[in-house]
Regions:
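N-terminal signal-anchor transmembrane alpha helix
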Residues: 13-52
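Aromatic/pi-system hotspot detector in well-structured domains
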Residues: 32, 93, 97, 137
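Individual transmembrane alpha-helix segments
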Residues: 68-108
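Structural signal for the C-terminal ends of transmembrane alpha-helices
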Residues: 113-119
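Short, Lys/Arg-rich, polar N-terminal cytosolic tail immediately upstream
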Residues: 1-10
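Lipid-exposed faces of alpha-helical membrane segments in multi-pass integral membrane proteins
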Residues: 20-27, 31, 103-113, 129-136
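Membrane-interfacial loop-to-transmembrane alpha-helix junctions, especially the N-terminal start
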Residues: 14-18, 121-131
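Histidine-/acidic- and/or cysteine-rich, low-complexity loops and terminal segments associated
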Residues: 36-84
């Protein structure tokens, strides 16, 4: 994607922004792969965009999350003998993966809003398309 922007300082800022997005997404791919390899993908059974950002903070929270996990088929059919400590390991992989997703969304959206006032509209279409694709990742 080539953008012709007059201000060289703005070009540097956009390059740094998109370069940092590249690295965040690269980290996300690695963490996502490790999440799959450890079968951690279903350890958090509810997707709570805002309230789910905090991990369990005490033993009672851990018990609640573990009890929710015990209700899904993955636990009943495959991990029925899993202990709390084993659950915590897979939980953390999934939590980091989801946290990175939120971080990537914000790290893209906030500069996008700022640059929306600095860049010509015809160049913004591609940047907003990328944001749309980020939002609809599964």
């Amino acid at each position: 994607m080539t953008m012709y922007i007059d201000n060289s300082k703005l070009k540097v800022h956009i390059s740094l922004w998109l370069g940092s997005m590249f690295w965040l997404i690269s980290i996300m791919i690695i963490v996502g792969g490790l999440t799959r390899l450890t079968d951690s993908g279903l350890s958090i059974t509810k997707w709570q965009l805002f309230s789910g950002i905090l991990p369990p903070l005490n033993e009672n929270d851990w018990v609640q999350y573990f009890n929710l996990y015990k209700e899904i088929p993955e636990f009943k059919l495959q991990n029925y003998s899993m202990t709390m400590n084993e659950f915590k390991i897979i939980f953390w992989w999934e939590w980091i993966h989801r946290f990175l997703g939120r971080l990537i969304g914000l790290a893209y959206l906030i500069p996008l809003i700022y640059f929306s006032f600095k860049i010509k509209f015809k160049y913004l279409i591609n940047l907003y398309l990328i944001f749309f694709l980020i939002c609809f990742q599964g």
